[in-house]
Every structure is written in C-alpha cells, then in structure tokens.
Design a protein with these regions (language model features):
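Short N-terminal segments immediately surrounding and downstream of signal-peptide cleavage
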Residues: 24-40
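Bacterial N-terminal signal peptides
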Residues: 7-18
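Short hydrophobic beta-strand that contains or immediately precedes a catalytic carboxylate
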Residues: 35, 45-50, 66, 185-187
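Active-site neighborhoods of enzymes that stabilize oxyanions during catalysis
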Residues: 24-26, 72, 140-210, 289-298
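Positively charged n-region of N-terminal signal peptides that target proteins for export
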Residues: 1-6
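Thiolate-centered catalytic microenvironments shared by cysteine-dependent enzyme domains
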Residues: 85-175, 257-274, 279-280
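C-terminal soluble interaction/assembly domains
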Residues: 235, 245-298
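Helix-loop module immediately N-terminal to the HCX5R catalytic loop
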Residues: 73-101, 217-248
Length: 298
C-alpha cells in the first residue's frame, strides 16, 4: 500500500512538473472525423477565423466567425501582436468562449494557412484556456471530405471569461536579450530568409538571430498541408539538437509562423518549456546591439 501511494505521488509530481495541462480534454490537433463526431457537444466552440465573406459563403455548422486580424493586431511599429489584455478578453467573450469550452480553430486550409490557426490557438492558450485545438487541413479538409456546410450566421451569447495570462508561453524582447546566448532558438522561416538571401521589407536586418537553428515551419506538414506523423516531428527536432528537457524559444518575422512550432512542440508533442517570441525578427532587427548572421548555419 505504501509503495502504491509513493508511486501515485511520484506520478502526480511528474505531471505537475511537466508544465503540460494534463486536464486537457481534447487533442491539440483534431481531424475532420473527430470534429464531426463532436459537433453537438455543448462544450464545443468552432472558431472560424477566415474572412467574414468566406464564412458567409459557407462554414462548418455551428461555427462562430472571428476574423484572424482581430487576434493579431498592429501595435506601434510592430505587426501581428497579441491584442491588449482588455481587448483580448472581450474578443474571447464575444465568441461565447468560456473557461471550460472546447475550442477548435479553423482556417481556410492547412499548408500556408496552418500557422494562422496556430497563432489564434496559441493566443487562446496564452489567455488561459486549456482545451484548444486546430483543425488539421482546415476548412478545405472539411469540404473535401464531403461534410455538411452551413450559411446560417451563428452568434453565441457573450461569456464572462476572465483572462489567466500564462506569461511563460511568451518571450518578449527583454527575455530574448537575456537568453540569446544561452537558450536554443528555433527559426521557423524559410531557408532563404534564414540565410539572408531574402527578407521582408519591414525587417531591418538580413539573416537570423545569432546561434539560431533553422527549422522551416513547412517541415511539419505533408504535401496536402496536413501534419506529418508525431514520430517524424520528434525525430526532426532531436536531429536538429532540440530536446524535451530544454527551454526553447521560437521566432519568425512577426510571431505568426513560429506559433506553428510552439503549438506542435508544446501542445501536440507535450514538451513543456517553450516560448514564442511575438515581436520576432521585426522587433529584434531594430536593436543596434544585436547583429544578425548571414550565410551561416548558426
């Protein structure tokens, strides 16, 4: 009996120490079959983050429209930032999302739009929600499977959700400046951008953060824009030198693309210690004390 109690206590400590919400009630990534089977669950909120006109043309039955642009906003000179706390709370409330809701974020497709869905999902998790998922393959996967669509406008009653910010999901500039030479950084952008052959106009420097490891976000997806098997993602990350025991920081140009890696590593794989840098290259490249590196691997 004493041994059993000791083992139980050890198991609980392991779960608590993992940093992963073991109370999660839904998978971090759901497929069409799962979503169809759960459409009538009263806990479910299907959050359609496509453009309003796309939603009106047809959507998953019961889905609520909440355009992506409301979840990633311009703040001063920076693009695609987390909304101010009061705006974020109001946004969640207006979608009818409660603390115990099962939220499935739906974009137009997987592939090039996958990180739009994960950006919203990451923001919801950052806000304190536990049961959030993204639809693998997006709305395109739903229609390709021949599932029912609706044109009925859905408006849920506003909730009374209150924020419970998880600061350890976010890396800000101060955190980055303190840890740039000590923690592993994952660059989610393309090879060409990482090496400095190309860059976006609003990013002041070419290349990548000193010491950052290149892992384009597209590597987690197959030719149809759906997730590759979990084992392949773990194999890839391990081969690149990342491990579950490390604290990892992901970044890209604006904090959108890197949310895909954050979501997959933290929520899908269950690695507990990872942050997403919302300001990303757009912010850090403006700092004269940081010199980006070009045409080298690290």
């Amino acid at each position: 009996m004493r041994l059993s109690r000791a083992l139980l206590a050890m198991f609980i400590l392991i779960l608590l120490g993992s940093g992963v919400a073991f109370a999660r009630e839904i998978p971090a990534v759901v497929d069409v079959a799962w979503l169809e089977a759960n459409l009538n669950n009263p806990k479910l909120v299907v959050l359609d983050v496509r453009k309003a006109e796309d939603y009106k043309a047809g959507h998953i039955p019961g889905a609520v429209s909440s355009f992506f642009g409301s979840w990633a906003v311009k703040k001063g000179p920076l693009n695609a930032e987390i909304p101010e706390p009061e705006d974020l709370q109001e946004l969640i409330q207006s979608a009818g999302i409660q603390a115990g809701s099962w939220v499935v974020v739906v974009e137009s497709e997987g592939g090039p739009r996958f990180h739009f869905a994960t950006r919203v999902a990451w923001t919801l998790a950052y806000a304190g929600l536990d049961h959030v998922a993204v639809l693998d393959g997006g709305y395109a996967a739903w229609t390709k499977a021949g599932k029912t669509v609706s044109t009925e406008m859905v408006k849920k009653p506003a909730s009374k959700f209150t924020l419970n910010i998880r600061k350890d999901y976010l890396a800000d500039k101060n955190f980055v400046l303190k840890t740039l030479n000590t923690l592993p950084y994952l660059d989610a952008r393309s090879y060409d951008t990482y090496f400095g052959r190309t860059k976006l106009p609003f990013v002041a420097q070419e290349g990548h953060f000193p010491g950052a490891i290149s892992a384009p976000k597209e590597w987690m997806l197959d030719a149809e824009g759906k997730l590759v098997p979990k084992a392949k993602i773990e194999e890839l990350l391990t081969a690149l030198g990342f491990s579950e025991s490390q604290e990892i920081v992901t970044y890209c140009d604006t904090g959108m693309g890197c949310s895909a890696w954050w979501w997959i590593i933290h929520e899908y794989l269950g690695w507990p210690k990872i942050r997403s840098y919302d300001g990303s290259s757009e912010e850090l490249a403006k700092d004269p004390t940081v010199k980006f590196r070009k045409y080298v691997w690290r």
